[in-house]
A protein has these predicted regions:
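Nucleotide and nucleotide-moiety/phosphate-recognizing core
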Residues: 1-130, 138, 161-170
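Short, small-residue alpha-helix embedded
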Residues: 135-136, 140-143
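Short glycine- and hydrophobic/aromatic-rich loop-to-beta-strand nucleating segment
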Residues: 132-136, 175-177
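Conserved alpha/beta core of the MobA/IspD/sugar-nucleotide pyrophosphorylase nucleotidyltransferase superfamily
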Residues: 1, 142-194
Length: 194
């Protein structure tokens, strides 16, 4: 399982990983929910705000992997995670820490859905696209070298036949925190502390 927490939050101007919901940082919340699914291995990719984010996770289990190229975008963190999961041969759940409505039940539903999907993959529906959180195959993770910049696996998941990918419809996961407007909306909706 991969929790991506390396971003620099440049559009927000403050580390979104450390925003809180109910007094708990979003990164702690994401890792706690990920751990609740009892993964074989849990890695957290750190980059921007590395020490602050690691400190927020001090009481949780998981391997912290540092992405020295975090400024290059999401793909560089996926490359680090792929290297860190060498030897793991099962499905891989990939999630960020910027969806304040995320619950462990979302993650478990994705894992269960991927288990029954022909492709072995499951993804969250974001409008007409597929995205995070998502379950991908180990082979897809190993092929992350073809990703660049802020590319994730959404395009590859969308290119699979639609009936082979299990889809999670969870409107509450549409809200992810990228900028001040998202933060304001999340506070107004009760998803973040004010």
């Amino acid at each position: 399982m991969i929790v991506l927490a390396a971003g620099g939050s440049t559009r927000l101007g403050a580390p979104k990983q450390l925003l809180t919901r109910g007094g708990e940082t979003l990164v702690h919340r994401a890792v706690r929910h990920a751990a609740a699914t009892h993964p074989q291995r849990l890695v957290v990719v750190l980059g921007g705000y590395r020490s602050e984010v690691a400190c927020a996770l001090a009481d949780l289990n998981g391997d912290h992997l540092y992405n020295p190229r975090w400024r290059e975008g999401l793909a560089s963190s996926l490359h680090v995670a792929a290297q860190g999961l060498t030897g793991h041969d099962g499905p891989v759940l990939v999630l960020g820490c910027d969806q304040p409505a995320l619950e462990a039940t979302h993650l478990q539903r994705l894992l269960d859905g991927a288990n029954s999907a022909a492709s072995g993959c499951a993804a969250t529906v974001h409008g007409t696209a597929l995205g995070s959180p998502a379950v991908i195959t180990r082979a897809m993770l190993q092929d992350s070298g073809g990703l660049h910049g802020d590319q994730g696996f959404g395009g590859r998941l969308s290119s699979l036949s639609s009936d082979s990918v299990w889809r999670l419809d969870a409107a509450e996961l549409q809200l992810d925190i990228d900028d001040a407007a998202d933060q304001i909306a999340a506070i107004a909706g009760g998803w973040l502390d004010g």
